[in-house]
Amino acid sequence: MALVQERKQELVTKYKRHEKDTGSPEVQVALLTERIAYLTEHFKTHKKDHHSRRGLLKLVGQRRRLLDYLRSIDQGRYKTLIDQLGIRK
């Protein structure tokens, strides 16, 4: 399931860097984290859904790449974001 539009807007509002920001690494990572959390809950009841599990692994990889990029350009923003989202390093 895709994110509900209201929840998506909340995340964009919370993590945006300026007024019209929707594509900064912080916003993208927050949206991916929300989708990953949803799929993780989905797999607790649908253990054999291997097709969606592959999608989850792609999302995790994409989030990891964005976090690596953010860490390379600004260590402080990276640390703040992983603390706010509760992501392991």
From Swiss-Prot:
PROSITE patterns: RIBOSOMAL_S15
Domain of life: Bacteria
GO molecular function: rRNA binding; structural constituent of ribosome
Pfam hit, one: Ribosomal_S15
Coiled coil regions in record: none
Keywords: Ribonucleoprotein, Ribosomal protein, RNA-binding, rRNA-binding
GO biological processes: translation
Gene3D superfamilies, per the entry: 6.10.250.3130, S15/NS1, RNA-binding
Gene Ontology, cellular component aspect: cytosolic small ribosomal subunit
Subunit-structure text: Part of the 30S ribosomal subunit. Forms a bridge to the 50S subunit in the 70S ribosome, contacting the 23S rRNA.
PANTHER family xrefs: RIBOSOMAL PROTEIN S15, BACTERIAL AND ORGANELLAR, SMALL RIBOSOMAL SUBUNIT PROTEIN US15M
Family: Belongs to the universal ribosomal protein uS15 family.
Function summary: One of the primary rRNA binding proteins, it binds directly to 16S rRNA where it helps nucleate assembly of the platform of the 30S subunit by binding and bridging several RNA helices of the 16S rRNA.
Record's protein name: Small ribosomal subunit protein uS15
Source organism of this protein record: Anaeromyxobacter sp. (strain Fw109-5)
Record gene name: rpsO
